[in-house]
Amino acid sequence: EILHNIPPTPQQEEFIEKLMQFAQSGDATILGRAPLSETEDKAKMLIATDYARKMALDMRLIDPNYDDHTDNKASHCARMIAEYYRKYDAQKGTQFVFSDLGTFQPGQWNVYSEIKRKLVEDYGIPSSEIRFIQECKNEKARKAVIDAMNEGRVRVIFGSPSMLGTG
């Protein structure tokens, strides 16, 4: 296991300040949302924790209007996946990418698709070699993707620990 310390982007630093103000005051408008209901007010720290988890991964999980950033986690992850892909290209090395946040959902912005976009557009990795386990709707499709990985036709697969295994 290798841990990487990725400093917050400027937008994340700004949002951290807002999140601390929200946690102290309960004023949800600071975060750009409607005032909290009575029930939500009792759970404001859970709301703050949820926002913090999303913010830590990618600001666009909070609001898709936030900017991409060259130093966000999606960019770092894509760069590292591409480096490994190139380093082990001769062996058709494969990679499992685990995240239980920002998982693939067709038709909406998600971290999996964003990293794939970066891998294809920025690093020239063929789209056909990158898959999401969530695309597999049954065991037969799942087995086909795993077989393609074992053969080196799929080189990168994304999934949550519950969908892809424990890592």
Where are these regions (language model features)?
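Inter-lobe connector of SF1/SF2 helicase motors
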Residues: 1-69, 73, 82-83
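Phosphate/oxyanion-binding active-site loops and adjacent basic polyanion-contact surfaces
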Residues: 66-78, 107-112
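Short, high-confidence coil segments that cap the C-terminus of an alpha-helix
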Residues: 90-92, 153-154
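Conserved RecA-like ASCE P-loop NTPase motor core of nucleic-acid helicases/translocases
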Residues: 92-102
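Conserved helicase motor "Helicase C" RecA-like lobe of SF1/SF2 P-loop NTPases
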Residues: 101-134
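Conserved helicase ATPase core of P-loop NTP-dependent helicases/translocases
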Residues: 124-164
